[in-house]
Amino acid sequence: MCIRDSLDILINNAGTVYTGYMLDRSDEALENLSNVNFTSMIYTIRAFMPGMLEKNSGHIINISSASSMTGAPKLAVYAATKWAVAGLTESLRLEVQKMGKSGVRFSSIHPNFLKKGLFEGTKLNFLGQLLAPGVKSHDAVAKVIVNRAIKLGFHSPKVPWIMNQVVLLRALLPSSLLIKVSSLYGLYDMMDDYKGYEDGR
């Protein structure tokens, strides 16, 4: 049996980041960012989803980001790719329902920025960290994948769970007030001390 036909769980976790204003980045850099963060997921899903549909069983888990719930200065294209991941996941979930293949499940995971590694140095101010604290380790994300997505079947768990407040704020606040709140908790300045990729790749 081909591995494409026998896979039960696919976790799409490829990701990279370029920071800075969008117009300051090269076309090549932005294309690479889009390919790694989004387009690659389309190809892996197309490779393994047919086998899951055939047996009407399987779970595809796509790693998105907290930036899929709100924009972020100096992360415009990164955030856009993560919004795309969330939209792809939601749309495919509906597609398999229409196909009568509800045994194939889809989840998107939305972790806030990791304090170490790719987003080291990224931080909000004190108020912002209360509302949207950073993720301490990859293990915290892994536990959410296993416990909330795989075991409980959550469609789009946030990491940490308090990040659901961001979704609530977006739904309740008018745009003009949401901009002020974003400034108040330090969203505009969160990339000022970024150290994750100091070479600017």
Question: Model-derived features: where do they sit?
Answer:
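Short, small-residue-biased leader/transition segments that mark boundaries at the very start
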Residues: M1-I3
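Conserved NAD(P)H cofactor-binding loop of Rossmann-fold oxidoreductase domains
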Residues: N13-Y18
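Substrate-binding pocket helix/loop in short-chain dehydrogenase/reductase
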Residues: Y21-M22, S26-N32
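Active-site loop immediately N-terminal to the catalytic Tyr-X3-Lys motif
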Residues: L23, A72-A76
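Active-site helix of classical SDR
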Residues: I45, T81
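Residue(s) in the substrate-gating loop at a strand-loop-helix junction
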Residues: S65
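SDR active-site lid
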Residues: Q97-W161
